């Protein structure tokens, strides 16, 4: 009993460390380059492609799609961006957020101490505010891998538990269970990056038969649920914002919901395509990269489909969130 409690505390402690690292990384990068990135977003004109590229670039740098989405909602409420300009930026945010999963797939837990030390030395060595902010960002990046290592240590014994293994076998057999699990985790933690990191770590653990606990086919529905759950931040942030800001949040939700529905319906093809685009090797060695690639594939394909349909998306969300009737 005492050992189980220790493992639970270690798991949630690792998750807390990861979430703190994500928040510190985002804030440090905002300090280092935030004003320029805001100017980049505000300068987006009528070109949807430029909007996608700007959204992807800013999110990749800030490492927080939620922060960029809230920023876009603020610009729309202030009249700096129109609804039609903002929607492609949101599409780009979804692509930019996949950079986190790609970085975490490198499995740098073994050198996390070196990353932490490098960040600390940069903080002390740099005199300027931006230099220290970069040092704090590097240190926060090391905290991400420290949190992942702690979560992995806690999850190792779970992989051998018969009850847990039975539940995971049901997730593999029924994709909707994985979808709900991913949705529930992201709604609870309020960070799709954290839940995807947890998924990558978990899938890389061996089960009783030596293969992945989830396997790629079991992990992808959870990933799709994560993508649905991440839309709640924008929805909550838009509640007190302008009508067009609410429509931007609705567009974000429609983008992820429709994509998740289509990809879940075509799950076997999704699995095969992800495997074909990923490195070959032992399952446990490559599955974290496969999940990262699946995340990127989902968001890139959805953007390529929705980008030419931006006017349709705008009309749809305008009907979904209509103007108030004039009395």
Where do the model's predicted regions map?
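Alpha-helical transmembrane segments of multi-pass membrane proteins, especially transporters
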Residues: 15, 35, 39, 43, ...
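Interfacial loop-to-helix junctions that mark the boundaries of transmembrane helices
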Residues: 1-9, 102-111, 165-170, 217-220, ...
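Hydrophobic core segments of alpha-helical transmembrane domains in multi-pass membrane transport
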Residues: 11-23, 55-59, 117-126, 140-150, ...
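Membrane-interfacial helix-loop connectors
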Residues: 59-62, 70-94, 103-111, 119-124, ...
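Transmembrane alpha-helical segments and their short flanking loops
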Residues: 148, 155-171, 237-327
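Alpha-helical transmembrane segments and their lipid-water interface positions
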Residues: 17, 27-30, 66-70, 97-105, ...
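Membrane-spanning helices that line or support transport/gating and their immediate boundary helices
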Residues: 20, 24-32, 36, 40, ...
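Helix-loop-helix hairpins and the membrane-proximal interhelical loops
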Residues: 2-48, 138-184, 202, 211
């Amino acid at each position: 009993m005492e050992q189980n409690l220790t493992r639970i505390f270690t798991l949630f402690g690792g998750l807390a460390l990861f979430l703190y690292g994500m928040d510190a990384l985002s804030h440090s990068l905002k300090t280092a380059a935030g004003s320029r990135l805001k100017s980049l977003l505000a300068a987006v004109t009528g070109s949807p492609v430029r909007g996608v590229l700007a959204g992807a670039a800013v999110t990749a740098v800030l490492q927080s799609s939620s922060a960029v989405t809230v920023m876009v909602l603020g610009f729309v409420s202030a009249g700096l961006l129109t609804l039609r300009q903002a929607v492609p930026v949101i599409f780009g945010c979804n692509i930019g957020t996949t950079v986190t999963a790609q970085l975490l797939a490198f499995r740098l837990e073994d050198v996390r101490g070196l990353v932490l030390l490098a960040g600390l030395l940069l903080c002390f060595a740099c005199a300027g505010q931006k230099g220290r902010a970069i040092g704090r960002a590097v240190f926060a990046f090391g905290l991400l891998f420290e949190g992942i290592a702690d979560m992995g240590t806690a999850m190792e014994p779970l992989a051998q538990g018969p009850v847990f293994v039975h539940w995971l076998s049901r997730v593999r057999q029924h994709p909707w269970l994985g979808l709900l699990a991913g949705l529930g985790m992201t709604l609870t933690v309020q960070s799709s990056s954290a839940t995807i990191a947890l998924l990558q770590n978990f899938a890389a653990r061996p089960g009783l038969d030596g293969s992945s606990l989830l396997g790629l086919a079991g992990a992808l529905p959870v990933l799709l649920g994560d993508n649905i759950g991440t839309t709640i931040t924008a929805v909550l942030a838009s509640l007190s914002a302008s009508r067009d800001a609410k429509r931007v949040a609705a567009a974000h939700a429609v983008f992820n919901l429709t994509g998740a529905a289509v990809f879940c319906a075509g799950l076997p093809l999704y699995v095969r395509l992800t495997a074909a685009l990923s490195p070959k090797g032992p399952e446990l060695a490559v599955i974290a990269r496969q999940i990262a690639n699946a995340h990127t594939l989902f968001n890139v394909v959805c953007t390529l489909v929705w980008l030419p349909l931006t006017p349709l998306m705008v009309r749809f969300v305008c009907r979904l969130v209509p103007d108030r009737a004039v009395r």
